[in-house]
């Protein structure tokens, strides 16, 4: 599994690096330069915008290029509570720091109902409603995305709009989001190298109605403190295939979680997942909670302190079933109630056990 994820990650990095070796290098088709209150958007030798509006400069540069062409935003600035839109086939590099405000229901950057959009590099600051917002995308590639936020939600794939397919992400680093770092709905075919979440209010990575997913590392520190959320959460029929089955199709190489709320959380008829390894310590809520989930395998790893490892079920859904957990658990408890169907435990360490 680890080898497979490394191969997938290498392929993703190759996809990103073939666009450019570093942000803004080479010969972008359009650029945004300037500082302070003066910005220029250029395409080739022609200026397509000159003025004080940073967002307008970026949008003018994007609107000036065609599918397959690239914009490099070299300048740093603020777009305020506004939105940048990226059309099909365009490549957007945010080399400078793009500071954003909160536009209710919208992303600071959006790509909706598009094919082949790439964002190889982005640095974002501020307090967005959504930092990046997507729906109806196909062959979307996100590369090195860094968000140093003071609130809001990092990356959001919408619930009530068109589904997405073949989404690839490189290294996503989100600090300070008030909600989730990365939240998905309705993706078939998802590859993520790494999600790093620091001081995030809700989830590090939240997968919902997402199938055929391969994730390398989910790394959370002080994620979801004081809440029922988790560094890594699967919810709302995540991993359930169109057939209704939970054949394994969600693969996660490793989850690391320190402090915060829960470490790993599966809920609301999700499943079909294999987690190769966990490293969980001092979680304020459950280190692991699997509740009404089906065909989940945790192949190994460690739990140290924190809230209990728990298998549970609510009355409104079928009881949890076909679960296999292999762990070393210390300074904690392992609790199964109500009893799952076809439950396989392999627990070492000094944990107290209350299982069926």
What do these predicted regions represent?
Residues 1-21:
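Fungal secretory targeting signals
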Residues 81-83, 101-107, 127-133, 151-157, ...:
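Short glycine/acidic-rich loop motifs that flank beta-strands on beta-rich extracellular proteins
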Residues 21-60:
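Right-handed parallel beta-helix/beta-solenoid
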Residues 61-69:
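Beta-strand repeat architectures
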């Amino acid at each position: 599994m680890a080898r497979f994820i490394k191969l997938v990650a290498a392929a993703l990095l190759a996809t990103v690096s073939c666009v450019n070796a570093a942000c803004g290098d080479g010969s972008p088709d359009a650029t945004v330069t300037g500082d302070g209150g003066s910005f220029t958007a250029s395409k080739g030798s022609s200026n397509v915008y000159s003025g004080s509006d940073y967002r307008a400069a970026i949008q003018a540069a994007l609107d000036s290029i065609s599918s397959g062409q690239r914009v490099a935003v070299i300048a740093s600035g603020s777009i305020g509570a506004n939105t940048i839109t990226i059309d099909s086939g365009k490549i957007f590099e945010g080399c400078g720091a793009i500071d954003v405000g909160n536009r209710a229901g919208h992303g600071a950057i959006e790509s909706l109902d598009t094919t082949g959009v790439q964002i190889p590099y982005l640095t974002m600051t501020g307090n967005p409603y959504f930092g990046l917002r997507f729906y109806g995308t196909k062959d979307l590639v996100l590369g090195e995305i860094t968000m140093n936020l003071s609130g809001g939600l990092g990356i959001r794939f919408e619930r009530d709009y068109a589904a997405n397919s073949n989404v690839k992400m490189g290294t996503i680093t989100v600090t300070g989001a008030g909600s989730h770092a990365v939240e998905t709905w309705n993706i078939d075919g998802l590859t993520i190298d790494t999600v790093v979440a620091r001081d995030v209010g809700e989830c590090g990575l939240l997968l919902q109605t997402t199938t055929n997913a391969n994730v390398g590392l989910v790394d959370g520190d002080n994620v979801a403190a004081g809440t029922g959320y988790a560094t890594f959460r699967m919810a709302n029929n995540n991993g359930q295939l169109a057939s209704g089955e939970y054949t394994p199709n969600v693969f996660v190489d490793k989850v690391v979680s320190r402090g915060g709320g829960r470490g790993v959380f599966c809920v609301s008829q999700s499943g079909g997942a294999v987690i190769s390894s966990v490293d969980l310590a001092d979680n304020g809520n459950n280190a692991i909670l699997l509740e009404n989930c089906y065909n989940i395998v945790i192949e190994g790893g460690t739990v140290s302190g924190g809230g209990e490892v728990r298998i549970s079920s609510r009355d409104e859904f079928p009881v949890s079933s076909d679960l296999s957990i292999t762990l070393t658990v210390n300074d904690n408890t392992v609790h199964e109630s109500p009893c799952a169907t076809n439950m396989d435990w392999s627990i070492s360490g000094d944990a107290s056990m209350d299982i069926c």
